[in-house]
Regions:
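Strand-loop microenvironment adjacent to phosphate/nucleotide-handling motifs in alpha/beta enzyme folds
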Residues: 1-5, 115, 145, 149-334
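N-terminal Rossmann NAD(P)H-binding glycine-rich loop of SDR-like oxidoreductase domains
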Residues: 6-26
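Rossmann-fold scaffold of SDR-type NAD(P)-dependent oxidoreductases
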Residues: 10, 73-82, 123
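Conserved S-adenosyl-L-methionine
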Residues: 23-32, 117
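Conserved glycine-rich Rossmann-like NAD(P)H-binding loop of the short-chain dehydrogenase/reductase
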Residues: 29-42
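Conserved residues in the N-terminal Rossmann fold of short-chain dehydrogenase/reductase
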Residues: 37, 59-60, 100, 249
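Conserved Rossmann-fold cofactor-binding substructure of NAD(P)-dependent oxidoreductases
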Residues: 57-78
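Conserved Rossmann-fold NAD(P)-dependent oxidoreductase catalytic core, especially the SDR/UDP-sugar
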Residues: 81, 85-141, 145, 149
Length: 334
């Protein structure tokens, strides 16, 4: 589907883009890949990695700027929306800015994609959008609903929108694994943990890319795709990084949950299970009963929840140590 196509990635200099771009170039050989982002230094650094590859282009711009988006989307077939304000405390202390990027930016992109006749758009979401308690999660919930509704908003146009929902991305820049590793390397003492009960979903960047590929292949429009991924206990992660270190329990930060949720009870009425993922179908227009969207899925039980503490798949301390050892060179780099 993506072979010989033109693909634009918003926020393409982030962790996702650094993995999605080379993997997609290798697997699909697209005609053109455009990285759309607002940080010129990150673009300059990323461009060095793709020097000489005429398929890769860079476009300075902000999702808040609809006119610039419209220009960037010229001759584009597919869009991945990865741009976001995503650090929870940053969003809490800068709420207006978070709304401008995560909500207004989504609206701008939806409008521009429809106007430009883009074929398919996949937006990246987060487990924090399910029953959100922080501003970041709330803005991503609104964003998810905007992209789902975009299929109706498009009217007679052919543009289709879907969403993929992730857990914590293992080893990405600013995530907990490089944070713990930096404390260990500096010998700064105890590893801070907000709550000893805390659990999190974990997904690799490669799994995230594959879920986007699957969404492009499978989508009819309006679906939210949720990858089946393992959970881990944060205390186990700390022990896997620094087995001898003391753990300091510092209390939950504003906007944090003890356990994360990917699919809530209220979504269970419209959720179908597949071997490697779940699919939440939109309630609007009776699309949740659409055979072309359900395909070979099995309806989950009403009241089903997919949370990081009730997950049947877990990463042990040994599993985490093995992953860290195998990915030592790239942890925190992208």
């Amino acid at each position: 589907m993506l072979s010989n196509q033109s693909i634009l990635v918003t926020g393409g200099t982030g962790s996702f883009g650094h993995t999605f771009i080379p993997m997609t170039l290798e697997k699909y050989n697209p005609r053109k890949m455009i990285i759309y982002s607002r940080d010129e230094m990150k673009q300059w650094e990323m461009a060095k990695k793709f020097e000489g590859d005429s398929r890769v282009r860079f476009f300075i711009g902000d999702v808040r700027d609809k006119e610039r988006l419209n220009r960037a989307l010229d001759d584009v077939d597919y869009v991945v929306h990865a741009a976001a304000t995503k650090i929870v405390p940053t969003a809490e202390y800068n709420p207006f800015e978070c709304v401008k990027t995560n909500i207004n930016g989504a609206m701008n992109l939806i409008d521009a994609c429809i106007d430009r006749g883009i074929k398919r758009v996949v937006a990246l979401s987060t487990d924090k959008a399910s029953s959100p308690i922080n501003l970041y999660g709330a803005t991503k919930l609104v964003s998810d609903k905007l992209f789902v509704a975009g299929n109706s908003y498009a009217g007679g146009h052919d543009t289709r929108f879907s969403v993929v929902r992730y857990g914590n991305v293992m080893g990405s820049r600013g995530s907990v694994i490089p944070f713990f590793m930096s404390i260990k390397e500096k010998g700064d003492g105890a590893l801070p943990i907000t709550d000893e009960r805390m659990t999190r979903f974990m997904i690799s960047l490669e799994q995230g890319v594959e879920l986007v590929w699957h969404a492009f292949e499978d989508m009819e429009g309006g679906e939210i795709y949720v990858k089946k991924i393992p959970s881990m206990k944060v205390v186990d992660l700390a022990r896997s990084v620094a087995p001898e270190a003391q753990l300091e329990f510092v209390g939950i930060r504003p906007g944090e949950k003890v356990h994360e949720q990917m699919i809530g009870e209220e979504d269970s009425f419209y959720t179908y299970e597949y071997p490697e993922h779940y699919k939440i179908l939109p309630a609007i227009h009776n699309w949740s009963n659409s055979e072309e969207r359900i395909k070979d899925g099995q309806k989950v039980a009403n009241g089903f929840c997919y949370t990081s503490n009730n997950n049947p798949h877990w990463m042990s301390v040994q599993d985490l140590q093995n992953w860290i050892k195998a990915n030592q060179q790239k942890i925190g780099e992208i």
